[in-house]
UniProtKB/Swiss-Prot annotation:
Its cofactor is Zn(2+). This is Endoribonuclease YbeY. InterPro entries: MetalPrtase_cat_dom_sf_prd, YbeY. It comes from Chlamydia trachomatis serovar D (strain ATCC VR-885 / DSM 19411 / UW-3/Cx). It is found in: Cytoplasm. Zn(2+) binds at residues 120, 124, 130. It is an enzyme of class 3 (hydrolase). It comes from the Bacteria. Its EC number is 3.1.-.-.
Amino acid sequence: MLILDRSSPQIFISNEQQDVSIDLQSAQRLVVLFLELQKVSTDQVYVYFLDDTALAQLHDEQFSDPSPTDTITLPIDKPGIASFPHVLGEAFVSPKAAMRFLEQYTEDQLYHEISRYVVHSLLHMLGYDDQTDEDKRIMQEQEDVSLSFLAEHQALLRPAV
């Protein structure tokens, strides 16, 4: 688990899967720059990279749905709400789901897709939803803007060295 220093938000990153190598510092940088882009202040954010079995189990526990999924978001404190510590939420991501979704991919495409899953969860923490077609369109637009910004700042996920 990697934790950012105390002067910044604490970004807890945990890689509990072995399907895809994840550089924890790149995940940390992605979250920090995303928060800066969105002008969100928080004390803590949690991101867990899980295998399909663990994510399906969590999916069943939280939503009574044992099917595999790509990401689960558990928002905790809404942005702008006073609490200490302010915990924006938890993101649970399956890198293997990105492998399945893409079928054939380059390394860059795979890490871009996994980065999209993290951004998607972070957007849910900010209150974005994807239940209606209009919500999905707005979410996709926000994902694309965020991913472009992160790519421009070399802050997408990358493999561990």
